[in-house]
C-alpha cells in the first residue's frame, strides 16, 4: 500500500541541507552541506557539500524548542548568529579582494584563516547532535561536516599549488552564500521571526549553489591529483612495521567516484523537500 506523507510549508518551523554541498552539506557533498546534512526541511542545502544533505528533523519546531530549554535555545541562537556573521565577514573579504586585485589569484591565501576557523568551528554541529539539542543524525552530520573539513584542511590547505585554481573560487562562493542563508534561516527561526525572503532563499538558492559547489570540489580534487601522485603525500607504503598500506591518490579517485551516485540522489531529494515546504505539495511514497 502507499503511504501518504504530507509536508506543508512550516514557516519558521522548517529546516533544510556533501559533500559541499553541503550542500547539504552537499554532501554536501559541499554546498551543498547540517543541522546535519539531511533533508532541506531539516538540514543543509549545501551541498552544499556544494552543500547538500539528506533527511533529518526540524530543529525549530515550537514543541521541540520548548523541550530544548532556555539555555540550549540561547546557545543555538548565539551559535547561529556567530556563524552567520563569520560567513558574512568571509563574503565581504572575498568581494573586497576581487575589487582591489581584479583577479582570483591569491584570494584563498587572503581568506584562509577566516575560512579555516569558521569551517572547523562547525564541528560543534556534531556535538549538538550528540548531546541531543539538535534532533538529527550524528552520522549524517558527521559525514557532511567532515567532508567540508576534508576539503579545507586535506586538499586546499595541504596542496598549495591548487590554491589559485578557479575551481576553489567556485566552491568558496557556493559555500559562503549557502552558509549565510542557512545560518540566518536558523537564527530567524529560533527567534520566531522568519522573513519570507530568507525562507525562499533557503529553498531556492541550492538549485544553483549545490551543482556549483560540487563542481568546484570535484575540479579542485582533480587538480590535486598530479601533485598527490608525484609526492606520495599522506600515503603509507609497504613494508612497514604495521603491515598497512594506504594510497592517498587512489583514495581521492574513490572520493570523486562517490559523487556519481550521491549527487543525483541528494539533489532530487532536496527538490522534493522544496516542493513540500514552498508549495505544500502532498508526496505519495510507495511501501516496498
Swiss-Prot record:
GO molecular function: 3-hydroxyacyl-CoA dehydratase activity; enzyme binding; hydroxyapatite binding; very-long-chain (3R)-3-hydroxyacyl-CoA dehydratase activity
Glycosylation sites: 243
Tissue specificity remark: Isoform 1 is highly expressed in the myocardium, and to a lesser extent in skeletal and smooth muscular tissues including those from stomach, jejunum, and bladder. Also detected in gingival fibroblasts, periodontal ligament cells, osteoblasts and cementoblasts. Isoform 2 is specifically expressed by cementoblasts but also detected in periodontal ligament cells, heart, liver and kidney (at protein level).
Lipid metabolism among keywords: yes
Biased composition (Low complexity): 7-34
Post-translation changes: N-glycosylated.
Any GO BP: protein-containing complex assembly
Enzyme Commission number, as recorded: 4.2.1.134
Pathway: Lipid metabolism; fatty acid biosynthesis
Region Disordered: start-end pairs: 1-63
PTM sites of type Phosphoserine: 22
Ranges of the Cytoplasmic topological domain: 1-75, 132-141, 181-203, 270-288
Keyword rRNA-binding set for record: no
EC class: lyase
Disulfide bonds: none
Reaction catalyzed: a very-long-chain (3R)-3-hydroxyacyl-CoA = a very-long-chain (2E)-enoyl-CoA + H2O; (3R)-hydroxyhexadecanoyl-CoA = (2E)-hexadecenoyl-CoA + H2O; (3R)-hydroxyoctadecanoyl-CoA = (2E)-octadecenoyl-CoA + H2O; (3R)-hydroxyeicosanoyl-CoA = (2E)-eicosenoyl-CoA + H2O
Disease: Congenital myopathy 11: An autosomal recessive skeletal muscle disorder characterized clinically by severe hypotonia apparent at birth, motor delay, and walking difficulties. The course of the disease is non-progressive, and affected individuals achieve independent ambulation and tend to show improvement of muscle weakness throughout childhood and early adulthood.
Cited PANTHER family: VERY-LONG-CHAIN (3R)-3-HYDROXYACYL-COA DEHYDRATASE, VERY-LONG-CHAIN (3R)-3-HYDROXYACYL-COA DEHYDRATASE 1
Protein family per UniProt: Belongs to the very long-chain fatty acids dehydratase HACD family.
Assembly and binders: Interacts with TECR.
Name this polypeptide is given: Very-long-chain (3R)-3-hydroxyacyl-CoA dehydratase 1
Gene name in the database record: HACD1
Amino acid at each position: 500500500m502507499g503511504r501518504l506523507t504530507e509536508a506543508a510549508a512550516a514557516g519558521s518551523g522548517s529546516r533544510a541541507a556533501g559533500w559541499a554541498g553541503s550542500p547539504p552539506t552537499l554532501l554536501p557533498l559541499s554546498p551543498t552541506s547540517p543541522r546535519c546534512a539531511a533533508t532541506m526541511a531539516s538540514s543543509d542545502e549545501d551541498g552544499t557539500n556544494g552543500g547538500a544533505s539528506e533527511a533529518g528533523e526540524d530543529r525549530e519546531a515550537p514543541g521541540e524548542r520548548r523541550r530544548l530549554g532556555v539555555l540550549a535555545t540561547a546557545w543555538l541562537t548565539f551559535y547561529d548568529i556567530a556563524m552567520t556573521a563569520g560567513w558574512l565577514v568571509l563574503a565581504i573579504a572575498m568581494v573586497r579582494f576581487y575589487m582591489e586585485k581584479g583577479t582570483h589569484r591569491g584570494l584563498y591565501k587572503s581568506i584562509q584563516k577566516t575560512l579555516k576557523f569558521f569551517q572547523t568551528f562547525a564541528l560543534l554541529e556534531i556535538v549538538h547532535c550528540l548531546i541531543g539539542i539538535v534532533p538529527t543524525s550524528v552520522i549524517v552530520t558527521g559525514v557532511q561536516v567532515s567532508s567540508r573539513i576534508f576539503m579545507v584542511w586535506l586538499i586546499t590547505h595541504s596542496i598549495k599549488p591548487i590554491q589559485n585554481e578557479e575551481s576553489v573560487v567556485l566552491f568558496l562562493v557556493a559555500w559562503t552564500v549557502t552558509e549565510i542563508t542557512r545560518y540566518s534561516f536558523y537564527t530567524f527561526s529560533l527567534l520566531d521571526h522568519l522573513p519570507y525572503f530568507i525562507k525562499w532563499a533557503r529553498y531556492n538558492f541550492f538549485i544553483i549553489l549545490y551543482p556549483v559547489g560540487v563542481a568546484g570540489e570535484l575540479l579542485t580534487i582533480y587538480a590535486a591529483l598530479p601533485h598527490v601522485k608525484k609526492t606520495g603525500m599522506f600515503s603509507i607504503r609497504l613494508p612497514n612495521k604495521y603491515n598497512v598500506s594506504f594510497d592517498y591518490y587512489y583514495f581521492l579517485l574513490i572520493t570523486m567516484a562517490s559523487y556519481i551516485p550521491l549527487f543525483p540522489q541528494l539533489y532530487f531529494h532536496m527538490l522534493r523537500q522544496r516542493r513540500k515546504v514552498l508549495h505544500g505539495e502532498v508526496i505519495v511514497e510507495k511501501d516496498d
